[in-house]
Amino acid sequence: MLRVLIVDDEMLARDELAYLLKRTNDEMEINEAENIESAFDQMMDQKPDLLFLDVDLSGENGFDIAKRLKKMKHPPAIVFATAYDQYALKAFEVDALDYLTKPFDEERIQQTLKKYKKVNRDIVETEQNSHAGQHKLALSVGESIVIVDTKDIIYAGTEDGHVNVKTFDHSYTVSDTLVVIEKKLPDSDFIRVHRSFVVNTEYIKEIQPWFNSTYNLIMKDGSKIPVSRTYAKELKKLLHI
């Protein structure tokens, strides 16, 4: 059963979205929260699969919760559901699955649920392939599916509002979010070093100190990847430095 959490400080908006979700005829457990504190309490307790999140929560910012969720080992998929359309690009920069604007449309919500199922199915299939010793990654590039060896991937990152997967031979602009790509990559080889970048540790050539306890990674193809303070400690631990 799909577990859904709706986070919105307006009760009518929560009720409308819950009603439309139930009309999809999917089996799901729907819970609601009116603020970030309540949302995190429920997330720790119920571990939702899918989070519908407003941007403006009575002085609190939905993007703050999205950034905090990215640090979780198994974060829920995030769908921003808001009255504002100007934050769509920013939403995808924090790896949102989708972006809905009020008033909600039932057909549009069905599209979001289909997208979630497809992404979730791809993750499960990738994990199964990984357990079977296969290290291929299927990338959605435009209307095509491109298959690459994970060992050939130098990094995956969000650049100019798009998620790119970089190999020595090519840079693929994909439709998946960075969180989805990260979940498909083997933990033994890849590490997140920034909210916008996941790198293959085999291709790190040099680590350059930057400012304010941050770093730049020079990859073997010449790419320069930033390392934020949030992830620097984990990187140094992994590389024994």
From Swiss-Prot:
The keyword DNA-binding applies. Its main location: cytoplasm. Residues 3-117 form the Response regulatory domain. Disulfide bonds: none annotated. Residues 137-241 form the HTH LytTR-type domain. Member of the two-component regulatory system LytS/LytT that probably regulates genes involved in cell wall metabolism. This is Sensory transduction protein LytT. It comes from Bacillus subtilis (strain 168).
